[in-house]
Amino acid sequence: VSLLMAFMATVIGTTVGGALSFFASRNLARHYATYFVTRRMLEIARTVPDIVWALIFIYPFGVGPLAGILALIIHTTGAQGKLFAEVNENIDHKAIEGIRASGGNWYEEIRFAVLPQVMPNFISYTFWRLALNVQAATVMGFVGAGGIGHELITAVKLLYFLDAGAILLMIICTVFMIDMSSEKLRHWIIGKETLVGS
């Protein structure tokens, strides 16, 4: 359940955050009001800890994985949106000027000038976020928001220390494997980007 929570939160949060990042980038937003409002929304979503979001969602939705998934989605959206916006603000503007000179609209600028430059970083940060969300999904169980953390806290309360130790070991191994895999994928993507750039 924890892995599924982390995966869903990463996919949905990264997709929404990625889309909002273009409106939260000072160099891409067409209107300052759009930039300001979107940026503040992302900052609020990112600044409030995911565990606090989980406690907020437990009130209307009750104890269970739904509250945990929603909490992770909100926090991931804010974190990824803010991070992606900073990536967007460091792009080379020559490609945008070329699209604009040929009569392209804002969406065509994003599609053909911005995305090719930022996509490698977007993918790299997405894998990094997945590893973070696996750890966060584990903690969600401590407040009744689903995940393997709930099984761990139950085992500790019932004094099933052998079971608790096994669960803890499984959590550590899972996080370690995902972290190592995502790190290798990030290095592979960055290395590929370097080769293409050269």
Language-model regions: role of each:
Residues 24-38:
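Short loop segments and helix-boundary regions at transmembrane helix junctions
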Residues 124, 165-198:
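C-terminal transmembrane helix and the adjacent membrane-cytosol boundary/short C-terminal tail
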